[in-house]
């Protein structure tokens, strides 16, 4: 019962996490945020592996997903610090775009209710560096929107880490119990096949 509930919870969580990651990937593509795009791509692949491992009882896949959940929390903490300019980080820097674009964030450039101003790019040969659109006077700061997205990702990743640890523990116990009763052990089969041959040899050498 515990195995089923833990697996079902992790399957539902992975499915929701996959939807949230795809939504975030779309907006990062629209904002040309190349570092988050790469991170989201890796995240989506590992979430799919975790989902597959949970359904198919693949312990290693679930372990990889669980370890990645901790890494994903760290990455999203960095994103929060970046957009809130904590620890000397600047949200106007080109750290997330690899200096390939002057765009900063789709939410910053297209957030409803903001006043936008197009700034021409100077000395940039990148195809996506034609203009930088900055927002001002927003009801909700776009940086907070990015931070809230990361907070949601952290919450899901923490739940995934807990559920992943539980599923790994259950899978490990099931493997240990299976090995204890002789699973994948050819030794008992050898003894079963050995007894008829020994009995047959005894019958052959019995005196008439």
From Swiss-Prot:
The chain crosses the membrane at residues 35-55, 62-82, 151-171. Keywords: Cell membrane, Membrane, Transmembrane, Transmembrane helix. GO terms for biological process: regulation of sodium ion transport. The keyword Transmembrane helix applies. It is found in: Cell membrane. It is a multi-pass membrane protein. It holds the Pfam family NKAIN. One of its GO terms (cellular component) is plasma membrane. It comes from the Eukaryota. Its main location: membrane. InterPro entries: Na/K-Atpase_Interacting. Interacts with ATP1B1. Belongs to the NKAIN family. This is Sodium/potassium-transporting ATPase subunit beta-1-interacting protein 4. It comes from Homo sapiens.
């Amino acid at each position: 019962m515990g195995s089923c509930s833990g697996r079902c919870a992790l399957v539902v969580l992975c499915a929701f996490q996959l939807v949230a990651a795809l939504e975030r990937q779309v907006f990062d593509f629209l904002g040309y945020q190349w570092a988050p795009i790469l991170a989201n791509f890796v995240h989506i692949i590992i979430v799919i592996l975790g989902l597959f491992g949970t359904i198919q009882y693949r312990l290693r896949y679930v372990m990889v997903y669980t370890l990645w959940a901790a890494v994903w929390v760290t990455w999203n903490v960095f994103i929060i610090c970046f957009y809130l300019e904590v620890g000397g980080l600047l949200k106007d820097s080109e750290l997330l775009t690899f200096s390939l674009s002057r765009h900063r964030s789709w939410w910053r450039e297209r957030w409803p209710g903001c006043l936008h101003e197009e700034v021409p790019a100077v000395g940039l040969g990148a195809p996506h560096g034609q203009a930088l659109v900055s927002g001002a006077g927003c009801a909700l700061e776009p940086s907070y929107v990015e931070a809230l997205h990361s907070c949601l990702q952290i919450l899901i990743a923490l739940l995934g880490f807990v559920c992943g640890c539980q599923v790994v523990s259950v899978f490990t116990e099931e493997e240990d119990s299976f090995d204890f009763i002789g699973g994948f052990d050819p030794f008992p089969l050898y003894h079963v096949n050995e007894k008829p041959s020994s009995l047959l040899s005894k019958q052959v050498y019995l005196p008439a």
